Every structure is written in structure tokens, then in C-alpha cells.
Amino acid sequence: MGTNKKKYLTYLAWFGFVLAFLMLARYLSFHVEAELDADLASDLVFAEYVSEEKNPVPTGWCYSTDLRVLNTQLIFAPLFYLIQNWHMIRVVGTLLCLAIMIGSYAWLAYNLEVSYFPVMAVLFLCPLSKEYIYVVLCGAAYTPHITISFLTVGTFLYLWKHSIREKKNRIILLFLELLSFGAGLAGYRQLLVCYIPFMITVGLFWMFSPKNKEYLKLVMLAMSALICAMVGNFVNTRWCMTKYNVTNYSLIHLKDFSFDRFEMVINGWLSNLGYKSDVDLFSAEGLFGNAFFAIIFLTVGAAILSAWKRQKQYYKKQMLVMVYFLCMAVVFLMLYLFTDVYYESRYLLPVTIWIVPVIAILFQNENKKICTVLAGILMVFCLITAFSYYNRPIINPNEEYENMAQILQENNMHESYATFWHANLLTEISNGSEEVWHCEIQNDQFMIQNVRPWLQKKEHGLRTPEGKCFILLSKEECDELAFTKKQKKSHVLYQSDQFVLYGFADYEELAEYISQPLR
């Protein structure tokens, strides 16, 4: 390929990357609220609390299953000092998280010695699947886990080929160990995503390579990082659990093999890659949407098959990453097949995202002309998919929260109750003006006395709301509760097909109202 033509294609690829980034930025600016839910909103509410406490991992928060150490609050929290608008904080913070994630891939790609970076960057920004859009492109929730994995493996490969005796490389080794400790300190997740699969991978290479001495250094590096991660995890289980409110993984149990779980995981990966089921085969979504899935699926399959057949042609570090990808998949598959751990298809994304370096390795080692054409086709499909998704007719399912937030502000109501599914979402959409305690419904009772210790401030369990109060419920929740069946409707501030909003002069009136017997 001529030099001028190569430059032209490179510029074109970078233009595609900039275009993909701008399309995403525009979509987030105008429509990100349509993608939000309680889980994603909880991240921003937590980040605001971090900025308020001036502590990156505050003890006054009720965490979920992971202690948030190296997580999105490190990006979002400082923005609260610079920007007053929660919507803009969401947009800017998400774009920064994505930029850091793509930068971490650049470090991995540099050490893998693979090209096609702008094409792979476009793939990162492509609305590949509903799961990827939700927790990466719009929520940025999984960007820390992906970033840590890319940084860790990239650093492994760098130190493998460079002398640790040099001062610069000793600093990089220290960075790797601190990163591993911080990742383990958050909980078990990153051990399963990164450190255990990589240790298995290098162990296999060390055992089965005829020149196993060359892998000994990598084994030592992997062991060092794994030990640091395990020490972090030990601190998490032995000390952090006594200081922080975090859900314990001890509730997970071993179970018998289940074909249902196997089918569930396989379908989850297909969904992660963009496969669209339950659509008409000959519809635009069925044909074009699944055509893009087929391109991704076949390219990944070709990459694995090519690496298997032409092992000698590939750099050893590239083969290492190919096997690591498979080891991650096996570890996750075993986790869901033989335990009762809760499953959502999005939990597979930290594994699925490794298709990007896998595809880059394929393009680097096969026929350049063919791979350049394939890279071009991949980029075009990514851009068309992005344009189609970002410009589709959009119905915002959260629009009513804006209306209710305005009503609450007009009535000077800023603290009160809802279930988890509405509480933090209302806080974010109201630009932080509404602080909402979330509690559970048990039998037919709204349990305001038992505030749920999950993704909210601990102080919510220690004090009651002040001033005028409200209760926000969905129609379905209303149908479950005893107090909503009363004939008295004077406390209803807002009612629609989806929500009912009750208003009260103070907490005492609220508590009395929901505890009164039926009339």
C-alpha cells in the first residue's frame, strides 16, 4: 500500500473516531436522561456525597456488593466543584470515563504491537448492544473495570519485555502492584475479571511451552499482582466489612450444574455482541442489526481460529491475550454454572469487551489489504449503527420525574421517601434538590421505619426527613399498599398512569397517614 494512500486511510479512520465521539457527546447532551435508571443515578448521587464529604471512599454510604475504591466517583466527584448542573456533570464525567478507558486500551495496544487504533476506538464508542449502551456508553458504570483490566495486562506485557532493574520500570511495577491492591480492595469482581484468569493463562503457557523459562518472569509478575489483589481483598473482607456497609459475598453458594444457566450465559454473550432476538427476521432491525452482530461474531471467530492455526506467525504476547480472553470466558462460565450468584447479562461485559484487542490482533497478522478492507467495513457499520441509534425516535421514560421535581420544588418539599427504583433517579433529575430516603414494601406496608441500607447515606437510617415531606410511588406499588386504598385523596399532589405523588406538612403527618387503618 502506498504511503500517501496509507496516510489518507489513517486520516479517514481518525475522522471516523472524532465523528463517533461527537455523535455520542450530542446524544448524551440531549437524551442521556432517557437511558437512566435507579442504579446509574445512584452512582452520581454517591459521587455528589463523595464531593460533600471530601473523602473518595466515605464510611457514611451504604454500598452494594462492591466497595467503590477505584471507581467512577474519582472522575465525577471533582466535577461537582466545577459544575453546578447535574446533567452536565453526567455528560462530561461519562465522556471522561470513556476517554480514560480508550486511553487504557491505547497502552495495551502499544504493548501488544497492534495497529488500527482509531478503528478500535470507534468500536468502543459504538452502541453495540443494549447492555453496552446502558452500563458503558451512558452510565460509565463498567468503565473502571475495563480500564483496570487493560492497564493491568498492558503493564504485564510491558514489564515482561523490559528490565525491572531500571528505575522507571520499578515505578511501573509499583504502579501495577498498587493498582492490583486497589482493585482487590473493592471486592471479588476484579479478581474474577482480571487477575485469576491471567494467572491461569500464564501458568498454562509456562507449563506447555518448550522454552518455559521465558515465561517465568511473567508468572512472577502475575503472581505478584494476584497476591496484591488478594491482600486487598483480604483487607476488604476482614477490615472494610467492619467499617463500611457492604453486602457480603458469603451469601453465594455452590450448586449443581445447570443447562439452563449455561444457555443463559451463552445468550447473554450473544446479546452483549448485539444479537437481537424477538424481532422480525426481515425487518430493518432483524436484518441490519443482526448483520452487524454477524460481522462482529464471525470476525472474533476468525481471530481465534487464525491464532490457533498460525501460532508461530503471532507474537507470543498476542497469543497470550487470545488465550487470556478464552480463560476469562471460562472462569465466568464456571462461576455462573456452579454457583447461585445473581446473574444479569451485563455482568459479562468486562469479558465481552476484550473482543476489541482480539480483533486488532487478527488485523495485525493477516493479509494487510484484506484486513484494511475489513477494518473499513467494521468502521462503516459502527458509524451507521451509531447514527441510527442516536437519531431514532426517542421516548423519554423518565420525563415525568422532571414534572414531579418541579411540583416538589414549587411546594418547597426537598426530603422524603420512595422505593429504590425512584429515589436516586429523582435526586439526579431534580439536579440534586430532592434528597430521597428509599425503603421497602413488605406485605402491604410502606416501611419508612426500616430504611434499606443500599446505595444511600447511612444517616437516612438515623434521622427522618425535615420540613414538608412527600411519598413517590409507582402505580404498581400503590396497588400493593394498604394506605393507598383510603378514600381520602387530599394528600395527592400529582397522579398519572405511572405515578402517584403524596404531599404532607411534615414527617409526623406522613407517618400518621400511612399507619391509619382503612376507612
Tell where the protein language model's regions lie, with residue ranges.
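Membrane-interface micro-motifs in multi-pass membrane enzymes
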Residues: T65, V69, L112-W160, V341-I355, ...
